[in-house]
Amino acid sequence: MRLLERDDAGEIRPTKDLPSGKIPPYAILSHTWGPDEEEVSYKDLKDGRAVSKLGYNKIRFCADQAWRDGRKFFWVDTCCIDKSNSTELQEAINSMFRWYRDAAKCYVYLTDVSTDKRDADGDPSWKWAFQKCKWFTRGWTLQELIAPTSVEFFSREKARIGDRNSLERMIHDVTGIPLEALRGSPLSDFSVHDRMAWMKQRNTTREEDMAYSLFGIFDVHLPLIYGEGKEKALERLREKIGKDDGCLADLRVTDPRHDKKRIEAAKGGLLKDSYCWVLSNVQFQQWHDGDDQRLLWINGDPGKGKTMLLCGIIDELKKSTPPGLLSFFFCQATDSRINNATAVLRGLIYLLVSQQPALISHVRRPYDHAGKKMFEGPNVWIVLCEIFTSILQDPGLRMTYLIIDALDECVTDLPQLLELITRTSCTSSPIKWIVSSRNWPDIEEQLETATQKARLSLELNAESISTAVNAFIQNRIDQLAPKTKHDANMIGKIRDYLHSHANGTFLWVALVCQALADPKVKKRHILAKLQTFPRGLDSLYARMLEQIGHSEDAELCKQILAVAAAVRRPISLDELASLVEMPDDVSDDPESLEEIVKLCGSFLIIRERTVYFVHQSAKDFLLGTASDKASNKASQEAFELVFPTGIEDVSYIIFWRSLNVMSQKLRRDIYCLNAPGFLIDNVRVPDPDPLATVRYSCIYWIDHLRDLVSSTSSKWVHLLQDDGDIHRFLTTKYLYWLEALSLLRALPEGINAIRQLESLLGHTIRGRLIAIVRDGYRFALSYRMIIEKAPLQAYTSALVFAPTDSMIKKIFKKEEPGWISTISVVEAEWNACTQTLEGHGSSVLSVAFSADGQRVASGSDDKTIKIWDTASGTGTQTLEGHGGSVWSVAFSPDRERVASGSDDKTIKIWDAASGTCTQTLEGHGGRVQSVAFSPDGQRVASGSDDHTIKIWDAASGTCTQTLEGHGSSVLSVAFSPDGQRVASGSGDKTIKIWDTASGTCTQTLEGHGGSVWSVAFSPDGQRVASGSDDKTIKIWDTASGTCTQTLEGHGGWVQSVVFSPDGQRVASGSDDHTIKIWDAVSGTCTQTLEGHGDSVWSVAFSPDGQRVASGSIDGTIKIWDAASGTCTQTLEGHGGWVHSVAFSPDGQRVASGSIDGTIKIWDAASGTCTQTLEGHGGWVQSVAFSPDGQRVASGSSDKTIKIWDTASGTCTQTLEGHGGWVQSVAFSPDGQRVASGSSDNTIKIWDTASGTCTQTLNVGSTATCLSFDYTNAYINTNIGRIQIATATMESLNQLSSPVCYSYGLGQDHRWITCNNQNVLWLPPEYHTSAFTMQGRKIVLGSYSGRIIIFLFSRDV
């Protein structure tokens, strides 16, 4: 930033560029521009021409006015920005709002407002001129009005006419800007629409500035692109705001501002007299005013008013001048949303970004890679810490106050949170912390490590607290008096009793006054009632529990208290009614239920129909963990009263009643979605919600079972036996439960729960139940992705594609869709593949497990790396930054980093938690084929196409060794277990062993007949396994260099090898689409894992529907029995992939089209080729016989259709007109027309006699499968059944989306559709490369080589 400086003599000169943090107090000028040639530029100042210009008059005014206000520095936009420097101009416009905001004063010089003129009555006429002045119509002056803390207005005569405060009503009337905005409320309090509307009556010289002048209002930074136009500039601004808002919405777990309002309302409002004492407290003032104390710990016993004290401090800090950032969070142990360190950090970041939106860049950086999932999973704390630390180091960060209430109620990861607080409180950033908690030694111990701290003990400020409590007592009595109609004498006695017994505890006063306000307490009994309340919070709890025990509903109240204390989150009244055995007259009457809960009012409170404890101390008291456990007998007695048979019995009740209510309530399609493909994003919760009573139970029932199993009780044993309650639930309601979990957006939690159940059973009883649980876990895991997206697919896709021997499939067979008559070739058992992870946009070239097996990294041809959670199968991170395909990935041994090697010749080191790139290692001269971490994680080895191996220091990124000696690309590298050696495999057919200290090659292992694609050390380092494109694996002795085993059996290149952890087995992966497991000692293959195969590119039915023909990448055509799914013929002869196959009408011949450019005619019985038709200039994508079998139509990548005479093999017609590859062709039943589908997204109808195109249908996607129906009125396609209208060619050419009927294939080939609606999701292994249909029969050919046949009995 560059300022102007006025010296004592009145001379004005520009300063040098001032860095952030070194800028002195300054004033700033706001004005309207005159003619460009009369405004003073930066160049004019430098050249000495400024004084001669008219615009200098404004600069002189600002200098003199600032001098009068005690400031010699000031800023004027015309001459403090070098507009000839585009970089400086960009930075200036993006910083303008901040410069106005940080100015000590803003002077608005209005050349069209005069204070010398008078109206007819002799009064000054400037008010009328002020309201009509040009300044209010300019775009850039909007931020100049709003941003500064002080804005003063001056007339043409340089006379002060008022400031923003004194003129606010007039300014509001002119501009329509709310008074709150003019008074300094955060702009984030106003909607995007409202802020945009403030520009309505304004204009700018350059049209793009209508958007650019709003950058500061929304605190966004975007590049300036003059020439793009106003609409494009506004579109970019809106897009940026939209993406930022989406990120902020995903970050938000709660809005602490709303929590503050809720807390204050629940406690009867914030009373200033109850907290104002702290403003004059020495410790608080030292923290607030000084620089040497950046952390203030406010500590005190329960009920001492810590939370309301912090609410008051927050309100006072909001009034700070200049305004800073204020972020706060209220922990609450009973609410799982806000009782953990992650939630605290999300809340603090949320408020910081809400107030200073430019800080969103620190969140967007990792968020743009990972999306919403960044805020989930085991690494979220690390990610949030990095974001938070980055925000605190932002050079544009204003003075920031961070406040956390009730650290003792942060029940998860408190030590991590305390470490973060102490660490950041010691930095030089402009931040200060206030935290509050009970007097817990472990909190004190960790906060003691902070070097710049202060402590404010409420017990040591007893006199101040007592005064504040007395004010609180008076406030409560003032509220009580009108309700109870007590006279002054009685009020005085109540006040005296409260004063003498409160013991400095706000909560004690609140609970007693609440009890006295009960309408059931008679006026004449009030003093007697008062006398029953003893001193001290725990004593009061004990007395109130005793009173509950004497009520008519004592047992019911105790049950409610027990359940409320045992559940894992606050529960709704509906959920409570399902977990506690209620009398009939209560369970069916919401008002009666609420009345019963209010009987527990000393302990519980109802907010928005959810039951909470009035205070954490109340819950602690009931659980026997009150503040003084050593001597507090009352708390232990309370525990024995509420949990007479132990808390495990309450866990049992919650578990059993959860199972019972789920069994009663859960049913298929509980939200009446009806459509099988109804997506979760479109679901709206019905009113009333049929899941209202079971929401808690669905998610937590297994947690309570686990509590029971881990206790000393033996009640759980029968639950885990065959034919018990759990067994019955799973065999009758399991699918309904999965559907409900999906609707509740809690399916991952459900999968983890069923895994816990499997673990519980695995250590106890064996039988049918454990088998069902294991199968259920596999079922849920396999189809998690689709059930999560479309809940009703639990009954369609999941049941249809589950193996035939799956117990869940057998048990729920009655739930299978009735509209599917038969389906062929579904596997009998769950295969070895437990998960398929989808998300990459291209081939996956490398995968690696983390050391703990909980994550997988994958590198892809799409230039990205993805991190996956292996338990749930969800992608947690997407790492972007490489400029080419990612050929290799590796986790560091500590699981915190990922290394990747790419086509772009670099290795990148990534933080696995945040997804940020921490190092880019450059130096290779070719593609990086392989990367590996050393066992200690301090080094990375890389192998490249440049024939070298490089060893890198992982911390500094420097190359410490370059190992040369291979004669071709280095395709694989591996460290030995001790890190002292590296093995490398190369395209020169050798393996080399290298000493990492000296960089010398100690062994060259020769014997392979092809490139060595993979090498691996055994765990003891004494052997190396190698895989080659000679189709073998070799085991080598590293000491002697001899080959001890050659493992043969693969039918293709061996591209990956690895030893088992015990060194006894070797696994190998090959491009023959198999994985083999070998005995490393004997060399025998013990297992072959199959599941991949060559892609099927085309399928066709025989006319009688009894056979199916398929064409494959392997160049063959296979004939299949459609009933049994067995292959009856293999036809070989094409020189490339077979893209299309078709039966002749009599079923005796098959036509096939290939990428070799030919069509072949085959005898279906003998398998011999009878004709080869040549003439296309590209791949033959589709073939079809005419109804009489005498002609064949073919469609090609050369964009033409050809008609062939099958007898002579001659081409009789070439049809041209498509703008893309012709993917499908079909004859009409009368043979007079041909339909063709193309990648240009059209279907054309051709007259076969003349060769002319008679109709063009714009269908919006590629029709890869076509056939006419028998009436000639419809065309059956992969996207559905399309009606052919009898209209002119011109009108049909304009048809953009014909109506599709019956069954088809979705545009993304992942859904089977019915009448254009998604009905059946296809799992990844069935993703379709070829499709054909005959009536209601559909055949799919998949990329994995599978053929699957569906017969649909009716429409959905």
From Swiss-Prot:
Record-listed GTP binding positions: 300-307
GTP-binding in keyword set: yes
InterPro entries linked to this entry: G-protein_beta_WD-40_rep (IPR020472), GPIID_WHD (IPR054471), HET (IPR010730), NACHT_NTPase (IPR007111), NPHP3-like_N (IPR056884), P-loop_NTPase (IPR027417), WD40/YVTN_repeat-like_dom_sf (IPR015943), WD40_repeat_CS (IPR019775)
PROSITE patterns, sorted: NACHT, WD_REPEATS_1, WD_REPEATS_2, WD_REPEATS_REGION
Key words, A-Z: GTP-binding, Nucleotide-binding, Repeat, WD repeat
Domain NACHT: 294-629
GO molecular function: GTP binding
Domain of life of the organism encoding this protein: Eukaryota
Positions of WD repeats: 839-869, 881-911, 923-953, 965-995, 1007-1037, 1049-1079, 1091-1121, 1133-1163, 1175-1205, 1217-1247
Pfam families, per database record: Beta-prop_WDR3_1st, GPIID_WHD, HET, NPHP3_N, WD40
Function: Responsible for vegetative incompatibility through specific interactions with different alleles of the unlinked gene, het-c.
Protein name per the record: Vegetative incompatibility protein HET-E-1
